[in-house]
Regions:
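Short hydrophobic/aromatic-enriched beta-strand-loop microsegments
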Residues: 87-94
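A short beta-strand-loop structural module common to alpha/beta enzyme folds
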Residues: 34-45
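Short Gly/Thr/Asp-enriched flexible loops that form oxyanion-binding sites at enzyme active sites
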Residues: 76-87
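Glycine-rich phosphate/diphosphate-binding loop of Rossmann-like nucleotide-binding domains
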Residues: 10-30, 35
Length: 133
């Protein structure tokens, strides 16, 4: 398992995942994380597949060790990110699965679906995923 050496993370969302991404981003920033947001403006967010591929590229190019991706179900953005070499993406809907995705499966990108994951749960999932060694 690759540990996170820095408190830097990249995030991105399509229109459906945007509000959840914003909640998680604020939460992480309050906890001292430096969050790079590839989709900072709702009206300018691309479709899920473009966001997923962009997030994956950030990991593949070595700019970030971990990424958080948000769309309606988490599945579409996960599929797109998984097409990028060196990306090991996981779709999770619970804190234990997010923790295990990182710790046991060496996932480096966590995808969440805003249709199924509430903001507080998403915050706890992000914490578990990013803290997992």
């Amino acid at each position: 398992m690759k540990t996170v050496r820095s408190k830097n993370v990249v995030v991105g969302a399509d229109f459906a995942g945007f509000p959840l991404k914003e909640a998680v981003k604020r939460h992480l920033e309050e906890r001292g994380w430096t969050v790079t947001d590839l989709t900072p403006v709702l009206e300018e967010t691309p479709m899920y597949h473009r966001v997923g591929f962009s997030l994956g590229a950030q990991i593949a190019e070595g700019r970030f060790e971990r990424a958080l991706a948000f769309c309606g179900t988490g599945m579409g953005i996960h599929i797109a990110a998984s097409k990028v070499p060196h990306v090991h993406a996981a779709v999770c809907e619970s804190v234990p699965s997010a923790r295990r995705a990182s710790a046991a499966n060496n996932a480096n990108l966590l995808a969440m679906g805003a249709f199924y994951v509430a903001p507080r749960t998403a915050m706890a999932m992000a914490d578990a995923f990013l803290a997992s060694e």
